[in-house]
Amino acid sequence: MQEKIAVLAYSGGLDTSCCLKLLEDKYDYKVISVAVDVGQPEDDLKEPEEKAKKFGVLKHYTIDAKEEFAKDYIFRAIKANALYEGYPLSTALARPLIAIKIAELAQEVGASAISHGCTGKGNDQFRFESVMRAKTPEIEIVAPIRDLNLTRTEEIAYAKEKGIPVPVDLEKPFSIDENLWGRSIEGGILEDPMTETPKECFAWTVDPTDAQDKEEYVEIDFEEGVPVAINGDALEAVSLIRKVNEIAGRNGVGRVDIVEDRVLGLKSRENYECPGAMLLITAHKALEQLVLTREELVFKEMVDSKYADLVYKGLWHEPLRLDLDAFIDKTQTRMNGKVVLKLYKGSMRIAGRESKDAIYNEEMVSFENKEMDQREIVGMVKFHGLQAAIYEGLTRK
């Protein structure tokens, strides 16, 4: 009888580490583990490989997808100013790419199942499975943590029983996810929205009170909506994002603490560190204000909001997302220029912006310019708000 193989999306954390053994113990699968490199720390890639080999997987793969993630996902998110309830979608953006890589490998090795470590209350189950079912509908999806209805405490107990080293305990049961675009921290005491996030939860950003005592200026150059240089230095995609993370992070910029609405309908308290994401999106929006017309800006704001909503829900493969990209790409053909930001102890302000495609006209807007005759505006002003004036008259009768 041919052995059953499950390809497991493996991060080395508590959930997926438990899945390594659960797939064997409860489902009778042999496991192939996969870590997809989307910019997480090197140790976060070495650790899964070492753990996987220790626990006897058939094979462990590490797939380098950093460049693809930066160019095909992050840069699209920047052009869309993609923020969901103030969150720049760091985890959400990476999930479809990870799912695609896992599904492709599962097909390649002839796997019977694809597995992930998502719980039944989180968003990632939707993000992974919507893509996996679209790409590999013939392959079963197994989610042991969800399907066995395990709690965090039960997982920790199971891990200890099986001798699985995990980076959490009952005192600090934080769940941390990290990639090129940001870092998320959730769980444990953070589930109480009245509890301040402990300093030790943060790794990318210094506490604003501890940041340097002088302002730092950073200049971002854009070409067709994509960041291409920092302070005049042209950089490749991955290097550029890492550099911006470093600059913003040392100034305490990029911490997000929100209560967000999950796909399932639950509200969840989430902490994020996204210094580079927040800086680049802020800079990009400032450039758009200089270049796009009022009607374009108003409509694009609606498009951007829907775009972020689709990404958050895991609907990267939804045709509407491609349609929105087509509109966004058209607006970005004129998005060429530079933006200067001033960073200081957690604050970020626009200090300057310029573009050869700017609709902003300094001469025309000047109070000293007579090119626009002010007297010609009288008729326009007279009838501005006409319907409201008519309504007001009716209410006085």
Swiss-Prot record:
It holds the Pfam family Arginosuc_syn_C. Keywords: Amino-acid biosynthesis, Arginine biosynthesis, ATP-binding, Cytoplasm, Ligase, Nucleotide-binding. Pathway: Amino-acid biosynthesis; L-arginine biosynthesis; L-arginine from L-ornithine and carbamoyl phosphate: step 2/3. L-aspartate binds at T119, N123, D124. It is found in: Cytoplasm. It catalyses: L-citrulline + L-aspartate + ATP = 2-(N(omega)-L-arginino)succinate + AMP + diphosphate + H(+). One of its GO terms (molecular function) is ATP binding. Its EC number is 6.3.4.5. GO terms for cellular component: cytoplasm. ATP binds at A9, Y10, S11, G12, G13, L14, D15, T16, S17, G117. GO terms for biological process: argininosuccinate metabolic process; L-arginine biosynthetic process; urea cycle. L-citrulline binds at Y87, N123, R127, S175, S184, E260, Y272. It comes from the Archaea. It is an enzyme of class 6 (ligase). Homotetramer. PANTHER family: ARGININOSUCCINATE SYNTHASE (PTHR11587:SF2). Belongs to the argininosuccinate synthase family. Type 1 subfamily. This is Argininosuccinate synthase. The lineage of its organism: Archaea, Methanobacteriati, Methanobacteriota, Methanomada group, Methanococci. The gene is argG.
